[in-house]
């Protein structure tokens, strides 16, 4: 099976330079919560990412269309449109787009002393209900 980390038509991604992240980690305000990477993958067919070696950031993934799945430890979850999940820092994990209905996702890597508070109880899929005048659109 084909497995792609990135390279999707229309994707957008920004990885902050290490020097910038280091400065944010030293600053009293931004050391509490800051992003390190941010992106958008539309119709990400064959998207797959596995991290056997844990990373020191939390990973927020918001699925706006399609479906996918993710694994934290031995627990596997399915995710569909208008759901998000947060992968914990320091824990091996994997995630993948559904090959028949590939997801469109926004994703953010974040860290900081307050990051665990924002990620609390978000290891399972959480629903988002966009409304007519919501800033979240699908």
Sequence positions of predicted segments:
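N-terminal regulatory/effector-sensing and dimerization cores
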Residues: 30-125
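A short, N-terminal "cap"/entry segment at the start of jelly-roll beta-barrel domains
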Residues: 1-34, 51, 128
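Generic detector of well-ordered alpha-helical segments enriched in charged/polar residues
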Residues: 21, 116-120, 137
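Aromatic/histidine-rich interaction motifs
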Residues: 121-138
């Amino acid at each position: 099976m084909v497995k792609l980390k990135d390279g999707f038509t229309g994707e957008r991604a920004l990885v902050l330079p290490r020097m910038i992240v280091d400065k944010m980690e030293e600053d009293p305000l931004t050391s509490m919560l800051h992003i390190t990477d941010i992106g958008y993958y539309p119709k990400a067919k064959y998207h797959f990412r596995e991290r056997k070696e844990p990373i020191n950031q939390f990973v927020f993934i918001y699925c706006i269309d399609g479906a996918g799945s993710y694994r934290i430890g031995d627990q596997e979850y399915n995710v569909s449109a208008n759901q998000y999940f947060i992968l914990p820092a320091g824990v091996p994990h994997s995630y993948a787009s559904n090959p028949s209905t590939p997801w469109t996702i926004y994703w953010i890597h974040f860290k900081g002393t307050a990051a665990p508070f924002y990620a609390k109880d978000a290891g399972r899929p959480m629903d988002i209900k966009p409304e007519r005048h919501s800033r979240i659109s699908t």
